[in-house]
Amino acid sequence: MSRTRIAVGVCVATIATASLASVSNAASTKFTAAMSGAQEVPTKGDAKTTGKATITVTGKKLCYTIVVRNLSGVPQAGHIHSGMKGKAGPVFVTLFGKPKAPKKSKLSGCVSATASQIKAISAKPSAYYVNVHTKEYPNGALRGQLKKS
């Protein structure tokens, strides 16, 4: 009986170690989006604002860096929306929802995403876009479609 317990213990330890190793060695997938106010629909965003979003997915963690130029106003929220180019769509993943520092040009952080969200974005990144909202542009100051990089 004690040999059985030892064998079971060794198996459990081996499986746990392998599971932890696979989580820590999870491959990352990177997506980018060239952003501008002109891409916002149905109303245009901030005409002079441009930017670039980089989204890195590792497991269920989604990390973002959004660099914006000439943004008028304080970033209030950032999202990934579902929607093809030229179409507005609902929020799919909230990146941030609290105001950032005034005129902050680099927005970054990490959020959790569900397996189904990650799978959907990975399957067809062009069906999703990143946008940043300000008080002046509550529907979005700038936007860019995702693409795998």
PLM regions and their residue ranges:
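Metal-centered catalytic cores of metalloenzymes
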Residues: 2-78, 82-149
